Structure formats: structure tokens, C-alpha cells
């Protein structure tokens, strides 16, 4: 019920407004529908749904018009939700044969699904939230990790453990001055 009640069909959350301004109405609506983005008092709700479309939790975040996060996040947990977290976007895995890409932030997964639709874009939610137990659920898939700048070495350990591919793009772009320290793949795509 909370998922349906929060669904941002009118693009009212600050993040949906950013998507609208950046990519236009059709693509913004596509992202809201694809990822089941919600709206809670103007803040976006990034719902975590597993492959069975069971709600695990909802991450509530405020964004400015520039698409930058404004404050710390909070969580919504339904009475009957499964408390064990999953990847943001995990519900998309069985809807496509595309390879999987994992990034840190939910915002980046949404943006990259527009900028590079040749992957199913998932987010782990934080640099330290790419955890081995979560990776086991996707080991049989073709997976590429896209760590933020300065996280390559940390994520490489997980990539090797699970035989995932890993991109060094953010490290290269940082060395060439294309992105700032701690930026991610979406920062590069939005500025180029």
C-alpha cells in the first residue's frame, strides 16, 4: 500500500523534477515507473524491491534542483516488509537478458539507465554496502561493477571474489581531470 500511495506519477519529488529538467518528461516518467520511485513530502523514495517484487525498504532522500543530495537519508519500512536489504533495482533482473551493472547510488542507477541502457542498472546504496552475501544472489549473471572514484580497490576485492568485471573508468576520468574526487559514472555522463 505505501508503495502505491507514494508512487510519483506526477513527477513531484525533487529528484523527479531533476530528471524532468535534465532528460525531459518521457524519460523521467520511464524512470519513475521502471524503478517505482516514490514521493514523500517532496523527497524521493527509492524503494528496494527484490526479484519477487517484495518490498524490502524505502530510502527517502532530498535533492536540490541541481540533482545534488541535500541532507542525510531516512528509511521507510512497511509492517510486512522483508527487512533484509537487496539491491535497488533488483526487481528488474528477470525482466531482461541484459548484463547487470552495479553502482553505489540509486540516483546514479536511474541516470545511467537513461545514459547507457545496455545494462540493467542496480545500486548497492553506499560504498560499503557492496557486500559478499548480497553478491551471491547475482553470481550467475554477467555483472560489471562501476565504483565511484576512490573506491576501485575496495570493490576490486568483491569483483575478484565473485568473478565480476570491474570498471576503472572513474579512476581514469579523475586522472584526466574529467571528474572530481569521489565523483561517479553519472557525474561524467552528465557533464560530457
Model regions and ranges:
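TOPRIM metal-binding catalytic domain and adjacent DNA-binding surface shared by DnaG-type primases
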Residues: 1-56, 92-95, 165, 192
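Generic intrinsically disordered, low-complexity segments enriched for polar/acidic and small residues
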Residues: 4, 12-15, 20, 32-33, ...
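Compositionally biased, intrinsically disordered low-complexity regions enriched in proline and serine
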Residues: 8, 16-19, 24, 36, ...
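Phosphate-handling DNA/RNA-contact segment within nucleic-acid enzymes
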Residues: 43-141
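TOPRIM fold recognition
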Residues: 51, 97-98, 109-192
Amino acid at each position: 500500500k505505501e508503495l502505491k500511495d507514494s508512487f510519483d506519477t506526477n513527477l513531484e519529488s525533487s529528484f523527479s523534477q531533476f530528471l524532468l529538467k535534465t532528460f525531459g518528461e518521457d524519460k523521467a516518467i520511464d524512470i519513475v515507473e521502471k524503478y517505482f520511485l516514490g514521493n514523500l513530502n517532496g523527497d524521493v523514495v527509492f524503494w528496494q524491491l527484490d526479484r519477487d517484487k517484495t518490498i524490502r525498504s524505502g530510502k527517502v532522500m532530498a535533492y536540490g534542483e541541481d540533482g545534488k543530495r541535500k541532507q542525510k537519508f531516512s528509511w521507510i519500512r512497511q509492517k510486512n516488509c522483508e527487512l533484509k536489504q537487496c539491491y535497488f533495482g533488483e526487481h528488474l533482473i528477470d525482466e531482461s537478458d541484459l548484463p547487470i551493472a552495479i553502482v553505489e547510488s540509486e540516483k546514479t542507477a536511474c541516470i545511467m539507465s537513461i545514459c547507457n541502457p545496455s545494462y540493467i542498472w542496480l545500486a548497492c546504496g553506499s560504498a560499503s554496502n557492496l557486500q559478499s552475501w548480497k553478491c551471491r544472489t547475482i553470481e550467475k549473471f554477467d555483472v560489471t561493477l562501476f565504483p565511484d572514484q576512490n573506491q576501485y580497490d575496495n570493490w576490486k576485492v568483491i569483483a575478484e571474489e565473485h568473478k565480476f568485471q570491474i570498471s576503472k573508468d572513474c579512476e581514469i576520468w579523475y586522472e584526466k581531470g574529467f571528474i572530481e574526487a569521489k565523483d561517479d559514472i553519472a557525474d561524467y555522463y552528465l557533464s560530457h
